[in-house]
Amino acid sequence: MSVQTYDDDYARDRAAIEDLMARYLFALDYNDLDTFIAMFTDDAVFDFARGRIEGKAAILEAVQSFKARIGEHYKDEDGNPAVLRHVLAHTAIRVEGHRAWTRAQWFEMANDGPGKSLKMGTFGIYEDKLERVDGRWLFSERRILNEFLPGRESGPGNPIRDMDALAG
């Protein structure tokens, strides 16, 4: 395992990457797909429950389709589309020059419980590769693991050790 070092730029890079990750979730949850797709490199890979997608146009099309299907699945008790919100728990970020890797735990909640109460729906881990392009951090690969879907779980090893092995 290689050890993360923290140079003078690490705090700035980490802040920019954390900001990107938060903006990603706001864009996704509020259906701002123009902002969402602008966060990816042109040749990005998006690996999620419906498969591995390559390239911005294909990613956008897949996410639009997925969001439409999710809207049909999550309903409040009156039959209206539920409000879905994603939350990041804790994030590890490794930066080396113009490349970075993240591991972050996430969960999703919706108001589809009794009395429109919140109910945790899904949870998992984001495994990201990022590139700094023209001074801006972008996702070059985002792999979304879902702990409740067979074949999409994390582990069995510590995800941070796996990230460090990739970087080192």
Enumerate the predicted regions with their spans.
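Short, low-complexity N-terminal intrinsically disordered segments enriched in polar/charged residues
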Residues: 1-39
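A beta-strand edge to alpha-helix "cap/lid" segment located at domain peripheries
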Residues: 2-5, 72, 79-168
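Charge-dense, low-complexity intrinsically disordered segments
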Residues: 7, 11, 53, 117
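Binding-site signature for planar aromatic cofactors or substrates
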Residues: 15, 19-21, 60, 155-158, ...
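Short, charged/polar micro-motifs that form catalytic or ligand-binding hotspots
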Residues: 26, 49, 116, 120
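A solvent-exposed, acidic/Ser-Thr-rich amphipathic alpha-helical stretch
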Residues: 33-107
